[in-house]
């Protein structure tokens, strides 16, 4: 099936060992309706030989029923899995796909191109390292292009690849390519985008996707796959500011007490002095435990269990940082907020806010402005509705560690949860911490407390927070 099918057949252990060491790149594709996002992903999977024969046969059969490419096989059907999407020829949900080459592993997020699915795109973009912005060569930079680029920039994606698609319909005209490139760069400069690359492609025929095209001799740059395999992403991670949100306290016996979680950013070593937030107590790292073996140090992204030299009171939601670092905490932050539910958001409404592993109650205090995702213009509004993006001030009942999102995506992001239904209603990216304010405790009605108890009793899989504990 793949480039390593022979190695898999001969020595599966060697293949797995080699595969484990590969770097992982997460990227998303976004563009206007019919720009060819799903076709491009299908082409990447097909030309990198990551499609099973039975999958290919199924797509050939479906092409005659749902296909949009005439006699040619419709590779978009490899990705458009939902029946509603196939019948409409569009992408609604975020479709994730996995593939690998000899150099890297990839996770693709195929995101919706329509404005009414802005929340879906924001979800797909939140964990990505790179974005492929598709532009139809016949139409150039459009309103949707600006919207997707703005969202990618807002979500902290540092690498942008502009794939100018359907160049085959214009005979790979170099002047068309250069004009679109100039238009996009003028817009990208306003968003502060620095690493922007351009590739002329035909997703339908495969030109410059995986294999270099003979139709564009004037193009001397890399193919799309070469860019994906070589773009440097290791430097994008924050290895400076150690942040360790405690997810679980592990006590298998009386002699062991470890704190489990993912290293959100930075590096920690055995012997390092750490501070527990919010209590401020300090201790030293005694050991770094993993399933395979103990480590001398742990890096960003690793799931580990830390043990400390002292008996310190630590629970889920606490944050471990290096004692020498000055890490500010506040209960008042300014953030960009993506609203994700049909129920309007009115300033002053009470919600639960989840920062890393810490759940705290609070309110969206005020709306600074709403951003028009198509024009990036600001407007004053009294409430937010589905798919709105706005600058807001958030006031919490407790102080949290909230880094700037552009500096630390792991601890600069939060979600907003409806306190009764436990539904995620918004996602936020911290712009700055504001001066802490005194807050009055949230007063839940007896009905709200009883309803919350019933939800937790009969629907434990929803993971609803215990409101009574939040009042303590």
Swiss-Prot record:
SUPFAM superfamilies: EF-Tu/eEF-1alpha/eIF2-gamma C-terminal domain (SSF50465), P-loop containing nucleoside triphosphate hydrolases (SSF52540), Translation proteins (SSF50447). The keyword Nucleotidyltransferase applies. Residues 202-204 are annotated as: G5. InterPro entries: CysN_GTP-bd, CysN_II, CysN_NoDQ_III, EFTu-like_2, G_TR_CS, GTP-eEF1A_C, P-loop_NTPase, Small_GTP-bd. Residues 22-239 form the tr-type G domain. Residues 31-38 are annotated as: G1. Residues 89-93 are annotated as: G2. Keywords: ATP-binding, GTP-binding, Nucleotide-binding, Nucleotidyltransferase, Transferase. PROSITE patterns: G_TR_1, G_TR_2. Pathway: Sulfur metabolism; hydrogen sulfide biosynthesis; sulfite from sulfate: step 1/3. It holds the Pfam family GTP_EFTU. Residues 110-113 are annotated as: G3. With CysD forms the ATP sulfurylase (ATPS) that catalyzes the adenylation of sulfate producing adenosine 5'-phosphosulfate (APS) and diphosphate, the first enzymatic step in sulfur assimilation pathway. APS synthesis involves the formation of a high-energy phosphoric-sulfuric acid anhydride bond driven by GTP hydrolysis by CysN coupled to ATP hydrolysis by CysD. PANTHER family: TRANSLATION FACTOR. This is Sulfate adenylyltransferase subunit 1.
């Amino acid at each position: 099936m793949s480039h390593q099918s022979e190695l898999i057949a001969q020595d599966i252990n060697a293949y797995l060992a080699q595969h484990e060491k590969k770097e992982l790149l997460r990227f998303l594709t976004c563009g206007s309706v019919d720009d060819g996002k799903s076709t491009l992903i299908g082409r990447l999977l097909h030309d990198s030989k990551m499609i099973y024969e039975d999958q290919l046969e199924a797509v050939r059969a479906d092409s005659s029923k749902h296909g949009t490419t005439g006699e040619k096989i419709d590779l978009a059907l490899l990705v458009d899995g939902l029946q509603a999407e196939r019948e409409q020829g569009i992408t609604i949900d975020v479709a994730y796909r996995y593939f690998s080459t000899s150099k890297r592993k990839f996770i693709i997020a195929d995101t919706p191109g329509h404005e009414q699915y802005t929340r879906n795109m924001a979800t797909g973009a939140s964990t990505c390292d790179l974005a492929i912005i598709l532009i139809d060569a016949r139409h150039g930079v459009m309103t949707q292009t600006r919207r997707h680029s703005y969202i990618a920039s807002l979500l902290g994606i540092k690498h942008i690849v502009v794939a100018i698609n359907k160049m085959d319909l214009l005979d790979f005209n170099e002047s068309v390519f250069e004009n679109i490139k100039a238009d996009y760069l003028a817009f990208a400069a306003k968003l502060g985008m620095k690493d922007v690359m351009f590739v002329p492609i035909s997703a339908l025929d495969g030109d410059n996707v995986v294999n270099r095209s003979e139709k564009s001799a004037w193009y001397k740059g890399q193919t799309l796959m070469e860019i994906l395999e070589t773009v440097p992403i290791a430097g994008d991670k924050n290895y400076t500011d150690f942040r360790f949100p405690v997810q679980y306290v592990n006590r298998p016996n009386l002699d062991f007490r470890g704190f489990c979680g993912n290293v959100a950013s930075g590096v920690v070593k055995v012997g390092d002095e750490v501070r527990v937030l919010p209590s401020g107590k300090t201790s030293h790292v005694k050991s770094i435990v993993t399933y395979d073996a103990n480590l001398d140090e742990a890096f960003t992204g690793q799931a580990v269990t830390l043990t400390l030299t002292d008996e310190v009171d630590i629970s889920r939601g606490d944050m471990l940082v290096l004692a020498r670092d000055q890490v500010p905490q506040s209960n008042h932050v300014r953030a960009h907020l993506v609203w994700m539910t049909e129920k309007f958001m009115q300033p002053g409404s009470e919600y639960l806010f989840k920062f890393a592993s810490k759940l705290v109650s609070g309110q969206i205090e005020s709306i600074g402005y709403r951003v028009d995702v198509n024009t990036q213009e600001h407007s004053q509004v009294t409430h937010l509705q589905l798919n709105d993006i706005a600058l807001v001030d958030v006031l919490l009942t407790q102080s949290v560690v909230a880094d700037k999102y552009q500096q630390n995506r792991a601890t600069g992001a939060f979600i907003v949860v409806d306190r009764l239904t436990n539904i995620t209603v918004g996602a936020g990216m911290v712009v700055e911490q504001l001066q802490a304010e005194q807050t009055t405790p949230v007063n839940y009605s007896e009905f709200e407390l009883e309803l919350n108890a019933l939800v937790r009793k009969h629907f434990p899989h929803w993971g609803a927070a215990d409101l009574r504990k939040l009042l303590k």
